[in-house]
Amino acid sequence: MADVLGKQFEEKFKKDFSKLPNADIFRLHDQMSGYKVVSKNPSDYICYCYPYHFYIECKTVKGNTFSVNALTQYDKLLERANVKGQRAGVVIWFYEHDKIVYVPITTFEKLKLDGKKSVNIKMLDEKLYNMVEVPSKKLKVFFDSDYSVLLNLNEGW
């Protein structure tokens, strides 16, 4: 069920990001290697909304945590993080908590350096790491989300 929700969430992200003025969003499709899906892409989406260029990976999580090791695109996202005007990160839907959170890849880097194994939903309130809740209005299953919050983050996010 989580896989189905995850794919549907990716589509909902695309729809909601596209609502931003002059936004452009492109889906990078995963490649097949035999029977296994192997992504060589840096992210699910490449997005643009003046003045920022985004590499966004979308993840759906049932519980309180998202494992740092579950982010297979970590290295490729990190390569893109330190370019002025360019942002790389993960949009995580904690669906049991009805929260959508943006976590910059630089936060994943800091979590690893600090010996943390996962992003916990509670970290949002602790404010020890850079992450931001995406303003969202609950629908039946999904949300209408306002990704303009990503345009207001400081450089390095």
Please annotate each region the language model reported.
Residues L28, Y55-C58, V91-I92:
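Short, conserved beta-strand edge motifs with alternating hydrophobic and charged residues
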Residues V103-M123:
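A contiguous, mid-protein "functional segment" used to position or interact
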Residues N41:
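Beta-rich catalytic cores
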Residues Y45-G63:
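Conserved catalytic cores of phosphodiester-cleaving nucleases, focusing on short active-site segments
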Residues A81-K110:
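Nucleic-acid nuclease catalytic cores
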